[in-house]
A protein has these predicted regions:
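Polytopic transmembrane helical bundles with strong interfacial aromatic enrichment
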Residues: 1-298
Length: 298
């Protein structure tokens, strides 16, 4: 019988506690988009900072526990750990973005994505918080750099997804398709500001995605004797990279912006999620870690 991943021994309890604070933040931002109350927004952000701090502690606790039981590589390769790390970098992306832009309304979307990832990690029978020894091929110094680079990219693309949604809503209003502005849209910066932020965030994410793929190729060569094997995960990573390269290319050479770029940001993140989770669940391959009975490999 499945039981939730809640244990103080391996640190998973603290991720569950962080989920509670993320949900509080989500409800706060949900209230904010209807009320426009800045105090509620500030309290929601504080709750998110608390969640992020708890997650930082949880990762530290979990990694220390892994070393204590004789596992020398950070526990990041299975579904549970990747989900909580995904939530972590998505929250980090929003925190950093909020420093430079007045995107409080984005908090509603970001906290929803983070809460969904944490809830999936905690309650899905596909995920387990038990820390297992990694296979020999994963016992490499490449592992940590590969994962961090990719998930920094995922966090940036998650932020661009939220910004893309905000842009499409704001654009619809500014183009007079919506006669009444409404409370929510009044809290969203101009479409020009959002468009600029989308571009910068995607460039940031693409740099890390490129680094992650290159590191992964070098790692594959040292572990399996080849840089590229057209594994389903590798193929979809390349597709994801091409989607965002298209974004940058069209922006620079064709002057694309606005609505087209916002749609690419939204669709691109759907591709990211499929590459990250869908491929591993639906298409068995070298990187499968979510399919029952498969080897946990990121």
């Amino acid at each position: 019988m499945f039981s939730p991943n809640i244990s103080i021994v391996d640190g998973s309890l603290f991720f569950t506690i962080s989920l509670i604070f993320v949900l509080v933040s989500f409800l706060g931002y949900f209230s904010f988009i209807f009320s426009g109350n800045k105090l509620i927004s500030k309290l929601s952000f504080i709750a998110l900072i608390i969640a992020f701090t708890i997650q930082t502690f949880a990762f530290t606790e979990r990694w220390i526990y892994a070393y204590k039981i004789g596992i020398d590589t950070p526990p990041l390769v299975d579904l549970y750990d990747s989900l909580v790390f995904f939530a972590y970098v998505v929250i980090l992306g929003f925190i950093l973005l909020r420093i430079f832009y007045d995107f409080d309304a984005l908090g509603f979307i970001i906290t929803f994505v983070a809460a969904a990832a944490l809830a999936f990690a905690t309650f899905s029978p596909l995920a387990t918080s038990a820390i297992e020894p990694t296979i020999p091929a994963l016992q490499s110094y490449w592992l940590l750099y590969h994962i961090i680079a990719l998930f920094m990219a995922y966090g940036a693309f998650g932020a661009s997804f939220g910004l893309g949604i905000l842009y499409l809503l704001k654009y619809k209003k500014e183009s007079n398709s919506v006669k009444k502005q409404g409370r929510f849209l009044s809290l969203v910066p101009s479409s020009t500001i959002i468009d600029e932020a989308i571009y910068k965030v995607i460039v940031f994410g693409l740099v890390f995605l490129t680094v992650g793929i290159v590191i992964g190729a070098a790692w594959a060569d040292s572990a399996w004797g080849g840089f590229w094997s057209w594994d389903p995960k590798e193929t979809w990573s390349l597709i994801t990279w091409l989607v965002y390269i298209l974004f940058i290319h069209a922006r620079i050479t064709k002057g694309w912006g606005g609505k087209k770029m916002a749609w690419i940001a939204v669709i691109g993140f759907v591709v990211v999620i499929f590459c990250y989770l869908g491929v591993d669940i639906l298409i068995p391959g070298l990187h499968s870690y979510a399919t029952p009975g498969s080897t946990p490999v990121l």
